[in-house]
UniProtKB/Swiss-Prot annotation:
Residues 34-196 form the SIS domain. PANTHER family: DNAA INITIATOR-ASSOCIATING PROTEIN DIAA, SEDOHEPTULOSE 7-PHOSPHATE ISOMERASE / DNAA INITIATOR-ASSOCIATING FACTOR FOR REPLICATION INITIATION. Homotetramer; dimer of dimers. It comes from the Bacteria. GO terms for biological process: carbohydrate derivative metabolic process; DNA replication. GO terms for molecular function: carbohydrate derivative binding. Required for the timely initiation of chromosomal replication via direct interactions with the DnaA initiator protein. CDD domains: SIS_GmhA (cd05006). Gene3D superfamilies: Glucose-6-phosphate isomerase like protein, domain 1. PROSITE patterns: SIS (PS51464). Belongs to the SIS family. DiaA subfamily. Keywords: DNA replication. This is DnaA initiator-associating protein DiaA.
Length: 196
């Protein structure tokens, strides 16, 4: 058992090192995409399933409340938090539409959809991205594996942050770290005006 614990930590560290080498440009582009949207008076819609839903909710909470520094609230909505809306849509046998319907109702040109999917193939996340495209929204996608179907939907203005791993737990860990990086960069850019 002790050896297995060491393996888990080692795999996580190795994934972090690989991500630290591969992802800074994509994370920086994503942060600037989010910052520009916020500066233009727009909002961020976030979605994911399971652990990805928790990461989406963490991002929205960090925008609305704060990340590490007291500052004004920023407009972000986690689309996975309203159980009444989710179950009403799913009850009509439209589970694949649980996020897309919300994107069509709440999303506007200039808004950003933060779509989080470990494999990039979750039908409801794919449909949300398709809906965001019809609303002239920009997409920031956090993925893993080969990016899945989600990666193929992204345009030149969109940003994919693909964790260099084929292990779901490591990808989800890195998604949380990436969300924290995005929150830090947004706060740093909008309120601290430091460029490290």
């Amino acid at each position: 058992m002790l050896e297995r614990i060491k393996v888990c930590f080692t795999e996580s560290i190795q994934t972090q090192i690989a991500a630290a080498e591969a992802l800074p440009d994509a994370i920086s582009r994503a942060a600037m995409t989010l910052v520009h949207s916020l500066l233009n008076g727009n909002k961020i819609l976030c979605c994911g399933n399971g652990t990805s839903a928790a990461n989406a909710q963490h991002f929205a909470a960090s925008m609305i409340n704060r990340f590490e520094t007291e500052r004004p609230s920023l407009p972000a909505i986690a689309l996975n938090t309203d159980n009444v809306v989710l179950t009403a849509i799913a009850n009509d046998r439209l589970h694949d539409e649980v996020y897309a319907k919300q994107v069509r109702a709440l999303g506007h040109a200039g808004d950003v959809l933060l779509a989080i999917s470990t494999r990039g193939n979750s039908r409801d996340i794919v449909k949300a991205v398709e809906a965001a495209v019809t609303r002239d929204m920009t997409i920031v996608a956090l993925t893993g594996y080969d990016g899945g179907e989600l990666a193929g939907l992204l345009g030149p203005q969109d940003v994919e942050i693909r964790i260099p791993s084929h292990h779901s737990a490591r990808i989800q860990e890195m998604h949380m770290l990436t969300v924290n990086c995005l929150c830090d960069l947004i706060d740093n850019t909008l309120f601290l005006h430091q460029d490290d």
